[in-house]
């Protein structure tokens, strides 16, 4: 089966740790590199700007590094974000960005953005529940963050494609995934931090947190959703290990973490690992996505269509944005 093909780029790179300006510069360079490789969409990993806070798995409280982290996080309405949007427009490429969002109260959130080839911010959301030790740094998302799929217009034979994204272990939340499927995504970006292979069957480390376990979750999302999945991971080399002092901790102990890949709608891996599987290697994984295969797989499994039983099982959703201050309504005056 053959249909219109969309070339995509999946980054596998080390962030500029805790350096907002350096992070934006590297992001712009990777956007340009992906466009030169004829990609129409480029994906970045979880917390790409300014890097995933690996120290939380070594020591949960570090006010010095945490302060620097907040100061180097990215605001949605900022000159830095405008620079990234301009790079998307100049290179005529869609950008799916993982970043740490800072707000004016100095709280930070694990966030994602989808930017069109025209430089428009089509979607911005926050991870609805940070995972385990991440809660020492990040706040929760809210109802509006359940909208995680956007229409991206690539023009030509491709036209409009529904592109969605989730962060890390959001791929282990069945109800959130089902709501994502209901938005009819055709391409899904699964964002992950640097992840290492599991040390062995007798090790106490969770297999579900390993490179193998995380890829399994991405492949499951592809099968259940009938969508292409761009499995995007970051890299952490000595610069990150030394800078965050993670040696001897649960994660980020050795250079590596990179396992980016493209996954087909039936769950198969489409691409080979970079540099013969060297997880410390930086680069870009490219893939040509035959969009007709989405249709073919949906014909077999459509979990929000013909392969569902809404008369028996259904999902309730509250998309309202929750605020800390809710003004009390004044009673209406009798006329």
Curated annotation (Swiss-Prot):
It comes from Arthroderma benhamiae (strain ATCC MYA-4681 / CBS 112371) (Trichophyton mentagrophytes). Optimum temperature is 45-50 degrees Celsius. The active site is at residues 46, 127, 168. The keyword Membrane does not apply. This is Arylacetonitrilase. Belongs to the carbon-nitrogen hydrolase superfamily. Nitrilase family. Nitrilase that hydrolyzes preferentially phenylacetonitrile, (R,S)-mandelonitrile, and 3-indolylacetonitrile. Keywords: Hydrolase. InterPro entries: C-N_Hydrolase (IPR003010), C-N_Hydrolase_sf (IPR036526), Nitrilases_CHs (IPR044149). It catalyses: a nitrile + 2 H2O = a carboxylate + NH4(+); 4-chlorophenylacetonitrile + 2 H2O = 4-chlorophenylacetate + NH4(+). Optimum pH is 5.0-10.5. It is an enzyme of class 3 (hydrolase). GO terms for molecular function: arylacetonitrilase activity. Residues 6-291 form the CN hydrolase domain. Its EC number is 3.5.5.1, 3.5.5.5. The lineage of its organism: Eukaryota, Fungi, Dikarya, Ascomycota, Pezizomycotina. It comes from the Eukaryota.
């Amino acid at each position: 089966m053959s249909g219109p093909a969309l070339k995509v780029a999946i980054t596998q790179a080390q962030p500029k740790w805790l350096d907002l300006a350096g992070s934006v510069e590297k992001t712009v360079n990777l956007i340009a590199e992906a466009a030169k490789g004829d990609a129409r969409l480029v994906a970045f990993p979880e917390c790409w700007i300014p890097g995933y806070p690996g120290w939380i798995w070594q020591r949960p409280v570090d006010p010095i590094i945490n302060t620097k982290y907040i100061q180097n996080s990215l605001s949605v309405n900022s000159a830095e974000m405008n620079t990234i949007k301009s790079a998307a427009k100049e290179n005529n490429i869609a950008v799916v960005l993982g970043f740490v969002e800072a707000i004016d109260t100095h709280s930070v959130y694990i966030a994602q953005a989808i930017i069109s080839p025209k430089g428009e911010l089509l979607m911005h959301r926050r991870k609805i529940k940070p995972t385990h030790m991440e809660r020492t740094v990040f706040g929760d998302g809210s109802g509006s963050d359940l909208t995680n799929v956007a229409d991206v217009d690539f023009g030509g034979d491709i036209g409009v494609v529904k592109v969605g994204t989730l962060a890390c272990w959001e791929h282990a939340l069945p109800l959130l995934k089902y709501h994502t499927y209901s938005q009819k995504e055709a391409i899904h970006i699964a964002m992950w931090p640097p992840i290492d292979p599991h040390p062995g069957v007798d090790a106490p480390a969770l297999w579900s947190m390993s490179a193998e376990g995380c890829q399994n979750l991405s492949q499951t999302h592809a099968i259940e959703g009938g969508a292409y999945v761009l499995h995007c991971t970051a890299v952490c080399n000595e610069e990150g290990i030394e800078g965050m002092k993670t040696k001897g901790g649960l994660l980020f102990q050795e250079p590596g973490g990179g396992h980016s890949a493209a996954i087909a709608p039936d769950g198969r891996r489409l691409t080979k690992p970079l540099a013969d599987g060297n997880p410390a290697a930086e680069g870009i994984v490219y893939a040509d996505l035959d969009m007709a295969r989405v249709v073919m797989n949906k014909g077999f499994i459509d979990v929000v269509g013909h392969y569902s039983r809404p008369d028996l099982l259904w999902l309730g959703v509250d998309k309202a944005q929750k605020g800390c201050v809710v003004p009390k309504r004044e009673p209406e005056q009798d006329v």
